[in-house]
Amino acid sequence: MERRLAAILAADMVGFSRQMQDDEVRTPSNLRHIQSTIIDPEIAVWRGRIFKTTGDGFLVEFASPMDALEGAIAIQKAAAAHNENKDSGEQAVFRMGLNIGDIMLDGDDVFGDGVNIAAHLEPLASPGGILVADTVQDQLWNKTDAAFESLGPQNLKNMDAPIVAYLVRAEPVRPGLVSWHPRTCPPLRRTLRRSAGDLIRI
């Protein structure tokens, strides 16, 4: 079994189940289109590797935390551009979590705390948002144009100690893109809602 340090991006499409209920024929086709025209090309540009898909989500391994962050931002911006003039059934809105940590590889399977932390950060993000662990912020705070806003320690599922999460703020791809507002959520997510309204300003 191989073990190494990697940057892991976890992403999930917001509202996929509702879209499936509304149109179970068009929704999978739309997701495949988004995968082939947005997700796969951006991940390839930033040298990532999708190692798991979950129907409406995916996990990506990057060798570089900078590549992982830039890839995540690029996907969110491309998705925002895609969503212009689209009805809700065709929009692609993602939540994302990003972490750097040890991973273990068993064949094509990738697991470990490096993966788990990214996966548990993702549901806490606002729609269209990116949350990163302190490991990412420590590496990149002075190396990127993106800004990091601390949300303080977060108690993640199955983690022995809290993880400090940071909200990523980046410049818009161009003016006038759609803004999304987070869903109603429990106290932890209300903290994110107050601070994440203009995340990536899309």
Model-derived regions: residue spans:
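Juxtacatalytic C-terminal regulatory tail of Ser/Thr protein kinases
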Residues: 169-189
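Acidic, proline/glycine-rich low-complexity intrinsically disordered segments
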Residues: 183-202
